[in-house]
Amino acid sequence: APPPRPPTPAPTPPTRPPAPPTFRPHPPPAAPAPAAPPTPRPQPSAAPQLPDRGWRRALRLATFGLIDLGPSPAQRREAQFEQAIQARLYGNYKVGVLGKGGVGKTSVAASVGSLFAELRRQDHVVAIDADTAFGRLGSRIDPASTGSFWELTADQNLRSFDDVVARLGRNAAGLHVLGGEPASGPRRVLDPAIYREATRRLDRHFTISVIDCGSTMDAPLTQEVLRDLDALIVVSSPWADGASAAARTLEWLADHGLTTLLANSLVVLNDSDGHADKRTRALLAREFVDHGRPVIEVPFDPHLRPGGVIDVNSEMAPATRRKFLEVTATIAGYFARRPDRSADRRPPEH
């Protein structure tokens, strides 16, 4: 018989990319586990929807309605998001936006606030710059605005809605903004007491507040902001270092007992420069999802890059707007499931 053949060596496994940052929250034992993110459940439309853009609309118009393919799947999905955003709310609500510098945190805050304002015309929506490192929220919404926390809190004659908005800026979507400390002029540092008084006044008139937070979790102002939030958006770059910072933010919330806020949070992977690697993005997104946090990827959009006023209606790319609609609808779902706190907060005065 022929001699036995030597065994074939096993192939060398391919080299795996570096593992993404690990998020391992350790909430107190008595706290409930984070609930699953809410699924928007829009009410059915009374009439069939017509395509409002693209080749489907062109075909319908060219044939005088004889050929009507209806809205595309993407348009139907957008309509679901919009109906979720427009769901009935009681009282007033706050969502914070956190992230380290350079990840597009302010762009996310301005975009989400603008969509809330555009789609909830019956309410008043305000964006608040609580970033003490010369935040730029005002320049993304209304660069002409000169109002500040100190003016808003010092004036004792601000009784009506019109009195208050005279101290605020506003964009075309209807989003009002309270800017932070200007880069020029005497330096004044926003403290928790001034922030608390300003938001108390704004709560009298605004249903939804979007707060652009500072990047230092242990800062007294950031902790004051977190204390009063109903939902949180954690913004990350689609790179390992940005995701590590986002993971540390979520761990900080768990370690400090903010498990309810953690359950009402989501991660936005924001491609702010257009150089993100698709495979890395997928790995990072899966890491957060595996640890119970919903992740929404926002693609690169040249409109958001220069640093000017954000226009969610005319200038923002449709794919980007669709992702921000999903972010905003998810936050609206968190708002809708909050227990009634009408005794804690005054209803908005219109």
Predicted regions mapped to residue ranges:
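Beta-strand-loop-alpha "switch" segments that mediate conformational coupling across diverse proteins
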Residues: 271-317
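Conserved C-terminal guanine-recognition region of P-loop GTPase G domains, centered on the G4
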Residues: 246-264
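Walker A/P-loop phosphate-binding motif and the immediately C-terminal alpha-helix
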Residues: 77-79, 91-131, 138-139, 202
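Inter-motif core of Ras-like GTPase G domains
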Residues: 203-207, 220-240
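Extreme N-terminal, non-catalytic leader segments
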Residues: 24-96
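Phosphate-binding loop that captures ATP/GTP phosphates
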Residues: 119-176
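NTP-binding/hydrolysis catalytic cores, primarily Walker-type P-loop NTPases
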Residues: 306-350
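Phosphate-binding/switch loop-helix module in NTP-utilizing enzymes
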Residues: 170-172, 176-220
